[in-house]
Amino acid sequence: MNKFINSFYFGNKTYYYHDLKKVFEKYPLLRKIPNSLKILLESNIRNANENEIETIINIFIQKSYFKQIRYVPTRVILNDSFGLPLFMDFAYIRDRQNIELNPKVMIDLIVDNRLAIDEPKRNQERYSFLKWASKNFTNLSVVPPNNERYPYINLEYLSTMLCSSMKEDKIVLYPETIVGTDSHSSLINALGVLGLRLDEFDTQASMFGSIKIIDFPKVVGVEIFGTLSQGLSFNDVIENLSNKLKEFGVKGKIVEFYGNGVKNITLENRATLSTLAQEYGAICGYFGVDNETISYIEQTRGVDASIIKEYFIKQGMYENDDLLYDEYIRFNLTAIKSVAYCSRKLSEDIEIKDIPSKLKSFKKGTFAKDNDVVLAIVASSKSTTSNIQACLVAKKACSLGLSINKNVKRYFEIDSYKIKEYLEKLDLIKYLDELGFEIVLKSPNKLIERVNIDTERFNLNVVAVTSSRNFEEEIHPRVKTNWYMSPALVIAYSLKGNMNFDITKEAIYQDIYLSDIFPSSGEVNEYLSKINYSLYEDIYKNIYHGNEFWQDIKVDENTNFDFDETFTYIRPFNIYEKRAIESIEINEAKILAFLDNDINTNNIVPKGKIVPYTQVGSYLEEKGLKPDQFDIYEKRYENSEVLKRAVFTNTKLKNKIVSPKEGAYARDFQNREIISFFEFSQRAKASRKDLVIIAGSNFGSKENSFLAVKGIKALGIRVIIAKSFDKSFKNDLIKIGILPLEFIDEDIESLDLKGDEVVTIKTEDIKLNGKIEIELKNDFFTKYTFVQYRFDSNSELNYYKNNGVLSYLISK
């Protein structure tokens, strides 16, 4: 234990912790650093050797943005779409290499309950493996399907905020820190838990105790002050703040929210803002710990959270707004205007008072007219506040005798029956029912028949009002315009039945105005206070039981999982080798393709329906499936046999070697045939030849490169030579053990390459951005050219020399 250790007595026990106040006494300049940096400071001090502490403290004092610090997660949270193939690979490696392979950090793997229940074959394969994995890997906890609160499980149930461990027979407390690949890791920042959303390879590394090295971050302080005016909802906060963050530019920075206005934002709404910050490229959107945080923990977990409060008070991180930031954004809740978005003007947020001025057509039909509301969809919000607010609008409307025109088709779209349940417990949902809103999981989006006929006959521009974020999509072929707004305003405009009025000033009906039916924040808070632990207890009491399908699955007691040959949805990837690469020796590798500039991940990994007469289609037919059982590519990429057959099979892909033919075709010069990439790779494998791709500039652009590089590796590609790479894609190639090389002065054209050349690369000198001479030879000539290694850091070099991240971690 280091010199900053301290202790406190609580509940008949002594707890030890790394005392930041001791640090501040010795280094007062650190006292006012942001709360998010205090979390990082504590973690770096706790995980440092004594001789490293001074260096760490100096980095924090000087805000050395060009220096690096550690990010040490205490827990990793995974969804099943990433976690399942990852643990399949672990299981395969354990079996083939006969090694003990378990995560070193606690893993929570959450199975998405929203997976279609009409997919028994897929579910059977996936769930049987996950259930086996939960019993055969240490430090792995699987949350099985059967929980409608999938996006919120970490926020509402799993997170503990504090961790404890035994060290020298002492209980040591420290803040929980999380990494993951989806929204579970970003939402948690609302709870005062630092959570980073990482790419798949970095998350994989974190599971095995590999410390994430990050650049010392800048922190943008977003001061929220003032109060929301009546008639506004949290949707308006989201839309206005979204524009602020977008204009300011927060990419690569931590966003930390603070100020008096934060106290009036519920924790669920804070979670929405945390996610919003990451949408604009921020490292995270962090909220410090305050009374709302502690109240939320006690409400959702049914525990006494006093020790959490005590810890953060002692660390100077409780309700502490007197801090210094690198940059500032001031956000005045009082100045917010209520806005709506029109599907015809996606880039423009329109103040609701200005909606009438945006309308251009005023034709009339027999039953309807232009700008009439004919479809109203109240999509349940992630925000409990917004749902209650909408119901209270309905309640007041009913009490005043208001009703909605029969021409308006009405739906209340819920993503969880628990939303319906808590609104029933609050005795609120009956008012939506009284106004004619049909409760559905997904809106069928039908129109009243006479309106449908009228709209077609008179070519009317009728509208839909919705609180669904997918408002820009076509809701109904007869509805030309969709207006996106808060759930409460959807109900208000439904009551009026037309968009051609200023809802802020004009009456909705006779002498009844928006202000008469819109609840105050006090009224909303009164209902919020009625939601207690019993609701969450009911949601989570059987969280690990799973649904009936899960419970019926029988798991083999064998410590090795049997990947049945009949499985068509899951197959492990045999692409990991535990071997060090001290030298490169590639002899007469075959060239698979010459590819254009700007090849992106969409070109590499196809999406959509699998059709017959393709490599994947033929494989599935061999497995006994009929074309109507093929499914879509995205659902079968957990099967290695599918991915390696699918990679590059974009019909518009251009391999210059077979030009003008398009698609994933290669030329077998030896047999004078044009064959598929997959067939070419199989022939190369049979003749024990490596494969090379030669490409133009910006190879691998766009997102989601994990599947792309995995597929390229599975296809047997060892080297990609390009004019330039997308930086993150290049990084991922290295992390899976593929060598990225860049041309220096020449390219395919200047070298006059034909594609029949074989490529030889030999060296014992593998170094950062070094140069290497390669040989290109065919029956008529031999050419030499220099290319450059694209290793930009020691970690990249280490990963490559160990054949990729996973192989590197296994070797350690």
Give the residues covered by each predicted segment.
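Fe-S-dependent hydro-lyases/dehydratases of central metabolism
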Residues: 1-812
